[in-house]
Structures are given as C-alpha cells and as structure tokens.
Swiss-Prot record:
<comment type="function">
    <text>Probable ATPase of unknown function. Its presence in a non-photosynthetic plant (Epifagus virginiana) and experiments in tobacco indicate that it has an essential function which is probably not related to photosynthesis.</text>
</comment>
<dbReference type="GO" id="GO:0005524">
    <property type="term" value="F:ATP binding"/>
</dbReference>
<dbReference type="GO" id="GO:0009570">
    <property type="term" value="C:chloroplast stroma"/>
</dbReference>
<comment type="similarity">
    <text>Belongs to the Ycf2 family.</text>
</comment>
<keyword id="KW-0547">Nucleotide-binding</keyword>
<keyword id="KW-0067">ATP-binding</keyword>
<keyword id="KW-0934">Plastid</keyword>
<keyword id="KW-0150">Chloroplast</keyword>
<protein>
    <recommendedName>
        <fullName>Protein Ycf2</fullName>
    </recommendedName>
</protein>
Length: 121
C-alpha cells in the first residue's frame, strides 16, 4: 500500500496534540455549520426537555425521600416524647399514691382498692 507506507513514516504522522487540535477545530466548524439548522434546533429542544424531565424526576425522588425521613423522624420523636410523658406520669402517680397512703389522705373506701393494686403501692 503506497499511502500506508508514506503516512506510517515518523516525520509524516502528526503527534497526539496536533491531531487533537485538528479534530476539535473540525468539530467546532461542524457544530457552527449545523447550529442554525431546524433539525438541530429541534433535537436540542428535545434534549433540553428530556434534561428538564430528568431533573424534575430527580428532585421529586429526593424531596420525597427527605419528606419520608422528616415524617419518620417526627413520628419517632413524638412517640418518644409521649412515652416519656406517660412513664413520668405513671411514676408521679405512684409516688403521689404512696405519699397519700402514708399520710392517710384517701377516704377509707379507696384504701381497699389502692392497697389491692400492688403496682401503685
């Protein structure tokens, strides 16, 4: 092959940087050449529309994940608060009952009921 032998010679083969410059300059010319063509603009509008849809999907997905985390965290904190409240109220009721039993602060008919309930005493 006469062309292959000529261009395979070291002095005639361009180096990587020169080939990169040539390729990018040719590509840029092609881009500018086709930039105002109707099919190119339509294609760009479709791509922009697809990017917009993908962005909205991503945002919707991530915002729903953060909303679920917020809801889950809020429920957990609410349950924790109510649990502590009921436990502390139960403890407070037990202490109050013990104090009133010691000081005979209950009417006599209540004493029977309270003394039978060992959890409060």
């Amino acid at each position: 092959d006469p062309f292959g032998s000529v261009f395979s010679h070291q002095e005639f083969s361009p180096d990587e940087e020169m080939s990169r410059i040539l390729l990018t300059s040719q590509t840029q010319k092609i881009d500018w050449k086709y930039l105002n063509k109707p099919w190119f603009r339509k294609n760009m509008q479709e791509q922009n529309f697809k990017l917009l849809i993908d962005r909205q999907r991503w945002f919707r997905t991530n915002s729903s994940v953060s909303n679920e985390f917020f809801r889950s965290n809020t429920l957990y904190e609410s349950y924790q608060y109510l649990s502590n409240l009921f436990l502390s109220n139960g403890t407070l009721l037990a202490q109050l009952t013990k104090t009133l039993l010691r000081k005979n602060g209950f009417p006599s008919e209540w004493l029977c009921t309270l003394s039978n309930n060992e959890r409060l005493v």
